[in-house]
Amino acid sequence: MSFKLRMEAAAENARSNLVLALDLPPNTPEKLFATSKNLLETVQPHICAVKFNRHLILPLGLFDGVQQLLKQAQNHGLPTIMDCKINDIGNTNRIIAEHYFQAGFDAVIANPFVGWEEGLHPVFETADQMNRGVILLVYMSHKGAWEGYGQNVVTKKTGKSLRQYEVFAEKALAWGADGAVVGATYPEKIRELHSILTEKVPIYSPGIGAQGGNIEAAVRSGSTYFIVGRAITQAENPSQAAENFKRAANMARRNRPCEV
Ligand code: BMP
């Protein structure tokens, strides 16, 4: 089963489209590991997948603590995503992807700015060989995202002027990406990009809560998966916070107009 279908099955099974960003503030490796393990255990009934970032990879090590957390997630039937934003030459990109896949990650996030040939082609090739997924950044959630993702570009093929994010959405379709990251902080961009990507490339939206994005607006605009970090991991009651996000998203999905 492809990563995209594994995500659909996990969401269906958990009755949740919430992806936990397992991000914690710096601490000793021992404390980070223990807190992550507990968090994952208490929050897992409300999520469909877990996204890891450098917050844990750097202090815990990929094949040490992180691999144990990956096994824990897998035991709960939760796919895992490595948010490594791959962004180098092809040979390096392939090695990065291979390491994360060998450790047990089900998907990696990559940056389409580097292009296909000797860029992301080797990553998609490796993912195909190992039956894993690749999710592309299409419009990030932070304030300065417009400087890169929002700039006007003239495409080589048609000479037409487009926004960088529109070009990236076309690439996500052409390259067979398993998902596209579009910030929940820009619901109008989600709407626009959903009309290009349709359901072929599901939208993953980070930026909910701590960055000001709203989960209902992301649902209404066409996002499929909702990535939440600090608003859960640093909440007084992480399980309750996750449950609240899950319920809000499910309610908004039920009331979503059919044109989205
Ligand atoms: P938080 O909910 O705490 O803001 O965390 C969001 C997570 O998603 C972080 O791991 C961040 O690096 C990641 N992320 C993001 O916030 N915006 C993007 O456009 C892409 C991301 O991967």
What residue ranges belong to the model's regions?
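Conserved N-terminal beta1-alpha1 strand-loop-helix module at the mouth
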Residues: 1-81, 155-167, 171, 177, ...
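Conserved, mostly hydrophobic/aromatic
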Residues: 20, 50, 83, 108, ...
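Active-site beta-loop-alpha junctions enriched in small/polar residues
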Residues: 21-27, 53-57, 85-89, 113, ...
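Conserved anion-binding
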Residues: 24-26, 88-181, 200
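Active-site-adjacent beta->alpha loops and helix N-cap segments on the catalytic face
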Residues: 56-72, 89-95, 112-132, 184-197, ...
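Short beta-strand/loop segments at the ligand-binding rim of alpha/beta enzyme cores
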Residues: 73-85, 131-134, 196-206
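A C-terminal functional module that forms or caps the active site or interfaces directly
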Residues: 180, 184-232
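C-terminal helical cap(s) of enzyme catalytic domains, especially alpha/beta-barrels
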Residues: 216-222, 230-260
